[in-house]
Amino acid sequence: MRTLIGLLVAVALAVPGQADAAQWGLSGEVGVARFGGTSRDSSGATLGPYRPTTFGLRVDRELGAVRVGIGVLYARTGLAGEQDQTAVVFYDRASLVEAAPEISITVARFGAGVVTRVAGGPSLDIWDVDGASRTRIGARGAVALEWPLSGRCTGSLRATGVLSGSVMNRDETPAGVGRRATRRGGVAIELRYRL
């Protein structure tokens, strides 16, 4: 992880380009997330995090069509047991702090400054479930639609997907319950300020 962060910083500082093309940016986002996987028993019942509101901050460096950055995300979530369209939710049982370096690339430009970007990178997820901390490494991908709001501000709608190890530890699942990779999908509205 340290090697990847070092590589991203080196690329951000070393990629040649026009002097005025390299821009730093600071973003804030608010979103919602939906989880899948985590643990499942033989009857099909699942247990996992349940639909939190997410808050994120990201600092990045834009080099033409490429943007390199690192983001931090926070979510406070409940744990839910779900089966046959029914959920039993235990609120405020877990929290997630995620650090995610990423590289994004512009894939399409539309009139009036609207841009579509794709992004990807690793994620480091630190979960606190009922006071017990656990760390998971995952992969993260995103698609964003950005539009200008003013000279220095852009807004965006961002869809993100993350795949990581199960939130549950081996000793937390009873017999007959299997741990599964945790999948997270999310949608967020973001405001970016060009520094």
Q: Residue ranges of each PLM-predicted region?
A:
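Transmembrane beta-strand segments of Gram-negative outer membrane beta-barrel proteins
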Residues: 22-34, 116-118
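Structural signature of outer-membrane beta-barrel domains
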Residues: 31-37, 75-79, 123-129, 162-168
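Surface-exposed strand-loop-strand hairpins of Gram-negative outer-membrane beta-barrel proteins
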Residues: 33-55, 134
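Short secondary-structure boundary/capping segments within folded domains
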Residues: 47-50, 58-63, 140, 181
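Predominantly the C-terminal beta-signal and adjacent terminal strand-loop region
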Residues: 45, 79-80, 141-195
